[in-house]
Amino acid sequence: MLRRAQCLLRLHGNGGHSLVSRFRNYATDEGNPKQNPNPNPRAQKPGTKNLPALRNPFAAAQDRTKNSYLTMVEIFQERDVHRRNHVEFIYAALKNMADFGVERDLEVYKALINVMPKGKFIPTNMFQAEFMHYPKQQQCIIDLLEQMEDCGVMPDHEMEAMLLNVFGRQGHPLRKYWRMMYWMPKFKNLSPWPLPDPVPDDTLEMAKLALERMCTVDLRSKITVFETSELKDAIDDTWIVSGMSPEQEKLLREHSRQKALYIEGPFHIWLRNRRINYFTLRADADSEFLSELDERQLDEDDVSHIEVPFFGRAPPRRHNQLGKLRSVHQQDDGTIMAICATGTSTKDSLLSWIRLLEANGNPSIGEVPVLFRFTSEVPAKAEEIEGGASVPATSDNSSQDEHISSRQK
């Protein structure tokens, strides 16, 4: 149509350029404010594209459960035969997994892998296989497997078949899967302190598991659960899990009445994704006793210098048969008398712990002064420093010490 108009204008002479421009504006709907009232200036620039806006359905969800999460994945799969934006959808789903509580669910990860089309991303020659055919899609699934590894979710053989159908045997996600299946079973049951999966929600049960793990350093240690309601003057009504061995009771009886004991903490121990606070009853190191020890004695718990008695080498000669031997509780920085975890982690509950230890076979603790030495929380101190407030210089005794006389109980 434009070519015919140009031919007519050439025959008629003047006004050709203005009329041709009018035809062009009519064909492109430009220059007409009625048909194009709000022209997009970015659309008129060469080299720019109008991309469709993507909506994140996971961020706007009201019911944040596993069923609603899987329902949104199914809606995306059934939306159209020719689906687009697979990578963006999977990344949005991975980002919002923690909000739905499905970051450790293998079924959900399988549903996300099933979003990818089957057969399209399989390389057909060695160049495509080595140079990462469809790199954006392959990296997306590799990031999904990486998140599974970070959350401790071990894949199964069904996931291998799914990756094989999507990316083929030479795909990089399948190589990542094989590496995970080689290492993760080795580390899954490597810990000598197995935990139930999932870990219990009861804080008392978690405290028992934590102290049992720490007290395995002495096989004769005994875990005892106290109730503060057994004491008349107890302020906090809570439970106390205490760990102590006969060797520690002996060290407590032999402890000098003139030297103080320290309740230090709270320290942290992690049981999977749960954190437990615990406290220690510690005494200063006995320098005279440590100086009398034979330097040639071998520490059976030291793994820094392990000698293997093979290949013609004589076994290491031990010097622990004669002389004084130190207990595993007697360290260079102090002697651990007992450890505990309480339901409230307050001074009142720790004071009740000392009274219960005295009433249950440790009467000598009532003749020894006890000091509280609480460590400050790191986040609170960091906020104080970043806020510009003046932080006083502190020494080793900077933590709050409070003298408690057991005779005044």
Curated annotation (Swiss-Prot):
Primary location class: cytoplasm
> What GO biological process, any one, is recorded here?
cell surface receptor protein serine/threonine kinase signaling pathway
**Listed Basic and acidic residues bias regions:** 400-409
Q: Where is the transit peptide?
A: 1-26
Xref: Pfam families: ECSIT_C (PF14784), ECSIT_N (PF06239)
Sequence segments annotated as region (Disordered): 27-53, 383-409
One Gene Ontology CC term in the entry: cytoplasm
- Subcellular localization, as worded in the UniProt entry: Cytoplasm; Nucleus; Mitochondrion
Q: Which UniProt keywords apply?
A: Cytoplasm, Immunity, Innate immunity, Mitochondrion, Nucleus, Transit peptide
Q: Which family does it belong to?
A: Belongs to the ECSIT family.
Subunit text: Interacts with Traf6. Associates with mitochondrial complex I assembly intermediates during its biogenesis.
Function in brief: As part of the MCIA complex, involved in the assembly of the mitochondrial complex I. Involved in the innate immune response; promotes the production of antibacterial peptides.
User: What PANTHER family does this protein map onto?
Assistant: ECSIT EVOLUTIONARILY CONSERVED SIGNALING INTERMEDIATE IN TOLL PATHWAYS (PTHR13113), EVOLUTIONARILY CONSERVED SIGNALING INTERMEDIATE IN TOLL PATHWAY, MITOCHONDRIAL (PTHR13113:SF1)
Could you tell me what this protein is called? Evolutionarily conserved signaling intermediate in Toll pathway, mitochondrial
Native organism is Drosophila melanogaster (Fruit fly)
What lineage does UniProt assign to this protein's organism? Eukaryota, Metazoa, Ecdysozoa, Arthropoda, Hexapoda
